[in-house]
């Protein structure tokens, strides 16, 4: 809201179109020379009533509002109802959803009204509150994404340096909101209402502007440069570096601090009987292998989802960030000739900011199996489809049962008991891709493990 002010929209209009009322081609700058009612009808017809392309914008905002509100509420409900989903990362995701809900409810409707009617109808108090809440939401989103990246970086790249806990995550969330509320106070202080038509200021609120009033040229430039660096460029660069290291660790190197992938050598079959308990030890080692591979797959899926969330955030906030800097710092768009294009860019950049709030739940649905199951359960409940309690419990035990089933199948092979007691560490880089073969896969094939079972086991 604060990034695109009403004068940008007003500047796109050609006031000489008032020649319908005035036969001269001079700009219509003195509305008091005409009948007030006639002038207000003219304003409604030419400026306030939505044009054809603006109806498309309205439809886009409605879709974003519904998806963002329902999707982010479902994210919060899913984590609240399921204790197994209350992880450190999911706590931060819930905080991100809360910020999206806040900006969707408080800021999206006001932004749409201003973009269409070019008027601030909400008074002086909300002129300070709504832009302030929007900037707070942006700050919360950026800091939350930064905390997620930092948490994943420590957990995967330096697990022995820092231990993430749910309590620390909750404390971090409180700090995020406090810091965001404090650093955005200047935004609330400088926002004021003013009329673009002083002659009708006492008769109508049309073309009332909610904009920044700094009282100087240096302060807004300094503020918006700092705002761009603190809320976009610097965090984005740091998060990109963090995820690059995470990518190298998960896809190219061994994950330090985790249990290593277990590999065993064949042993010559001895005529003597095996010691008591050796079969159970073999089963335990096989279970360790399954657990390790499952952990790798889970971490890769989580990292992939978070990288997509960061990418979408960077894309959605890039246009408005650039336009803000160009307008507030370099003074562009004040006397531009192509005002329709400028207006289109600002309105589209507004829509992208809110579309980011709607995109996050969609990303969770496609890239997180747990969130997808909870979303399906919620929609099924709303549609009146009732599942047995056992079906719901089965979803919570899916990962455990699949691992047990996998261990049981492998332990049934006769050659499992011939596995050596010797355990060696192997790098995660030896793990095969889904359609490739590596040293670990070749070794299992030599032990007689069927390729069909192995492809399912080692899928990443």
Curated annotation (Swiss-Prot):
GO (cellular component) term, any one: plasma membrane
Membrane-related topology note: Multi-pass membrane protein
Source taxon at top rank: Eukaryota
Molecular function GO terms recorded: orexin receptor activity; peptide hormone binding
Residues the record marks as carrying a glycan: 14, 22, 202
Ranges in the topological domain labelled Extracellular: 1-54, 111-127, 192-222, 327-342
S-S pairs: 127-210
Compartments where found: Cell membrane
UniProt main location, coarse: membrane
Tissue localization of expression: Widely expressed. Isoform 2 not detected in skeletal muscle and kidney.
Annotated site residues (Important for responses to orexin) in this chain: 44
A Pfam entry, by short name: Orexin_rec2
UniProt keywords, alphabetically: Cell membrane, Disulfide bond, G-protein coupled receptor, Glycoprotein, Membrane, Receptor, Transducer, Transmembrane, Transmembrane helix
Domains as described in the record: The N-terminal region is required for orexin signaling.
PANTHER family: G PROTEIN-COUPLED RECEPTOR 15-LIKE, LEUCOKININ RECEPTOR-RELATED
Primary role: Nonselective, high-affinity receptor for both orexin-A and orexin-B neuropeptides. Triggers an increase in cytoplasmic Ca(2+) levels in response to orexin-A binding.
Protein known as: Orexin receptor type 2
Gene: Hcrtr2
């Amino acid at each position: 809201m604060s990034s695109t002010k009403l004068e940008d929209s007003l500047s796109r209009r050609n006031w000489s179109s008032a020649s319908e009322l005035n036969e001269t081609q001079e700009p219509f700058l003195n509305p008091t020379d005409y009948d007030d009612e006639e002038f207000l009808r003219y304003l409604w017809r030419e400026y306030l009533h939505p044009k054809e392309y603006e109806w498309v914008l309205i439809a886009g905002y409605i879709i974003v509002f519904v998806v963002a509100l329902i999707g982010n509420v479902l994210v919060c409900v899913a984590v609240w109802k399921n204790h197994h989903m209350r992880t450190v990362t999911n706590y931060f995701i819930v905080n991100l959803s809360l910020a999206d809900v806040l900006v969707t409810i408080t800021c999206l409707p006001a932004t749409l009204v201003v973009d269409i009617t070019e008027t601030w109808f909400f008074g002086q108090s909300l002129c300070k509150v709504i832009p302030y809440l929007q900037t707070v939401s942006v700050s919360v989103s950026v800091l939350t994404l930064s905390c997620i990246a930092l948490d994943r970086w420590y957990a995967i790249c330096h697990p022995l340096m820092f231990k993430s806990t749910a309590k620390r995550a909750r404390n971090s969330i409180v700090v995020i909101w406090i810091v965001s509320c404090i650093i955005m106070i200047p935004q609330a202080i400088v926002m004021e209402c003013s009329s673009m038509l002083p002659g009708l200021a006492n008769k109508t609120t049309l073309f009332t502007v909610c904009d920044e009033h700094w009282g100087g040229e240096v302060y807004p430039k300094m503020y918006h440069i700092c705002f761009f660096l603190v809320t976009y460029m610097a965090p984005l660069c740091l998060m990109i570096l963090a995820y690059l290291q995470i990518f190298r660790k998960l896809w190219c190197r061994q994950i330090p601090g985790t249990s290593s992938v277990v590999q065993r050598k064949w042993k010559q079959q001895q005529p003597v009987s095996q010691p008591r308990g050796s079969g159970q030890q073999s089963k335990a080692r096989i279970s360790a292998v399954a657990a390790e591979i499952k952990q790798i797959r889970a971490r890769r899926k989580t990292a992939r989802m978070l990288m997509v969330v960061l990418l979408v955030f960077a894309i959605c906030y890039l246009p408005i960030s650039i336009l803000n800097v160009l307008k507030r710092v370099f003074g562009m768009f004040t006397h531009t000739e192509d005002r329709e294009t400028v207006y289109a860019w600002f309105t589209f950049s507004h829509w992208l900011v809110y579309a980011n709030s709607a995109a996050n739940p969609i990303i969770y649905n496609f890239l997180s199996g747990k969130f997808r199951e909870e979303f399906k359960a919620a929609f099924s409940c709303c549609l009146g489809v009732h599942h047995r309690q056992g079906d719901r419990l089965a979803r919570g035990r899916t990962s455990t049962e699949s691992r047990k089933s996998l261990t049981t199948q492998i332990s049934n092979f006769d050659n499992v008991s011939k596995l050596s007691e010797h355990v060696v560490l192997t790098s995660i880089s030896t793990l095969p891709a889904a359609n490739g073969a590596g040293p670990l896969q070749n070794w299992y094939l030599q032990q007689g493990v069927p390729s069909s079972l192995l492809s399912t086991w080692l899928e990443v």
